Regions:
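Structured mid-domain segments that build the active-site/substrate or prosthetic-cofactor binding neighborhood
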Residues: 262-263, 267-288
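Extended, helix-rich architectural segments
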Residues: 1-263, 271
């Protein structure tokens, strides 16, 4: 089992993350190539290098996205206990309202679209909130649920596993305000003292976002930013947050008490035996 206080184990973890990131590069490059076909030739000058008369990729993406994620899902909560029927109905309304408030249908549409080009990835977040009064004498601390879409450009997973459920790690990389990072109450202050803002130029490969953003630059960021990485470790049932560009002990370790599979959920259409990364429907249409 990995020990997050051991420098040897942390070095191995960073090496495994870097190896997996390099191993996923061809998949990201193929996805970017398919996205160029998806947007066509007239998208910011960075789309397809040839005229696309009948865009089968775009048409297929529209049909699947509308068909699979056109609206918010709804939950139904029932009980055999007559005394809890009223509570169950209130709970149902509360959850459905929460799903609507966090615009889950929009997130789901993006995840479905991602899956058509390779892999759709969602990340579940849970933040504590003040207790909510349901009845005169009943309070519930349900927390604030949030689901975000993770781009495969920012995602890393254990490629040595033959099944997703056997992956020893999954991770997502993201940029946050350096000011917010420094002032985060749960981050290790000793590690923060060794950190500094980082540049987007620190990454070594292009991303799909560059199709619209153009050249990689920090001029579009009005404040200093820093790159972090959240790593889901099934053995520890925890999420560890590390600096991306500086090997160190974790800034924070958050125990996970949610679903058994962890905070990430993956959606794919064309799984490949003995491989955790799938093929994609769009790869079969690209040649057409």
């Amino acid at each position: 089992m990995i020990d997050l206080t051991s420098e040897v184990h942390i070095t191995r973890l960073y090496n495994a993350i870097n190896s997996a990131r390099n191993g996923m590069r061809p998949f990201r490059e193929n996805r970017t190539s398919m996205l160029r076909e998806y947007v066509g030739r007239n998208y910011n000058g960075n789309g397809s290098d040839h005229e696309v008369i009948v865009n089968l990729i775009a048409q297929t993406a529209d049909v699947y996205t509308i068909g699979l994620a056109s609206t918010n899902p709804k939950v139904t909560i029932t009980t055999d206990n007559k005394e809890l029927i009223s509570f169950a109905d209130r709970f149902r309304v509360g959850i459905n309202n929460q799903i609507k408030e966090m615009r889950f249908s929009e997130t789901l549409q993006h995840i479905v679209l991602d899956s058509l080009f390779g892999l759709g990835i969602s990340k579940t977040h849970l933040a504590a909130t003040e207790p909510i009064q349901l009845e005169d004498d009943i309070w519930a601390d349900i927390g604030t649920i949030y689901v975000s879409r993770i781009s495969i450009d920012d995602f890393v997973m254990d490629l040595s596993a033959k099944e997703v459920r056997r992956c020893k790690f999954m991770a997502d990389e993201y940029r946050v305000s350096w000011e917010d990072c420094k002032n985060h109450e749960n981050f290790d202050k000793q590690i923060l003292q060794k950190m500094s803002p980082t540049s987007k130029n620190d990454r070594t490969e292009s991303q799909a976002n560059d199709i619209s953003a153009g050249y990689i630059t920090d001029d579009d960021e009005y404040e200093p930013m820093v790159d972090l990485i959240d790593i889901w470790l099934p053995e520890l049932k925890a999420i560890a947050t590390f600096p991306k560009h500086m090997q160190s002990k974790p800034l924070a370790v958050l125990p996970w008490d949610g679903a058994e599979g962890g905070c990430y959920d993956l959606l794919s259409f064309s799984d490949v035996p003995d491989n955790v990364l799938p093929s994609s429907p769009m790869s079969n249409l690209k040649a057409l």
